[in-house]
Amino acid sequence: MFTLPPVLNSSYVGIHGNSTFINFEFSFYTLPMLFLLVPILYIPITIIIILRILVKLYYAFRDRNNNVYLLSAISISQCMCLLFFLADFLYLRLPTSGLLTSWCASIEPNRFITILTIFTYHINYSTMIFPFLVSIMRLILIISPKNHKKFNGQLLRFSIPFICVYPIIFTFFMFPAIGYCSYAAYPFPFGAIIFRIERTFFGLVNNFSLLFNTLFWMTCCIITNFILLLLLIKSRCLLNAQTRSMHSYKVEVSLSLTTFSMIFSYLSNAMIVFLLLELHIVGHYASPIW
């Protein structure tokens, strides 16, 4: 029989109640603080891209464009990326900057940190699937140009609920946990903290499942885009020179850039997971509930 964990004793968990961290004085001149400011560069660009895609989606709905489902998937994907940036900012960048250290050391372990942890992992797992979904929809567009609207519509209606539910498989064991603040080990400077959780179901951790999902969806995305590229090259050879220069070449360049950006995002995510595993940050869950 499962029971919810009692509130953790702050005297022996993380930095809670530790006077050294309570009296910590934050400094702007640290490397984690620089990383905290990095999102200022790419989040506005992401918002502009999302707005442009939404405008195109509006006109696609108005004009009954056949690519409306593909544009819808891309729009949702970009919105999920924006949520991921927000989760990454709150879960990793903000605490490691040292801004929350004194405050976090003066409070008790709580479930708000658990909620933030679950939200971050949920968004991360969901975001991984969208590049593969967009690639499949583009593949359907090439393979079945006459019926792609029907197939892509059915695929999108199935995929959205699946993407919402799928991450629960890898986060359900976090639901009864208690979140707390812990100091971040080297190479982070003194005062940098990270969020962790205690007492998950069965003592399950999220490190290898996160790595598995990253590699799995990256592999699926690479295979799908490789097939797309082959089909695109084949179709390009069948077009006349004028059509090829005006249409196929632009699509091929766009596809190549899209493929590269997708693979790069997976690789960067995998490298971060490897780094955090090395630092014992990802999946540091203890004291299982029975």
UniProtKB/Swiss-Prot annotation:
InterPro entries: 7TM_GPCR_serpentine_rcpt_Sru. Its main location: membrane. One of its GO terms (cellular component) is membrane. It is a multi-pass membrane protein. It is found in: Membrane. The chain crosses the membrane at residues 31-51, 70-90, 112-134, 158-178, 185-205, 213-233, 262-282. It comes from the Eukaryota. Keywords: Membrane, Transmembrane, Transmembrane helix. It holds the Pfam family 7TM_GPCR_Sru. Belongs to the nematode receptor-like protein sru family. This is Serpentine receptor class U-26. It comes from Caenorhabditis elegans.
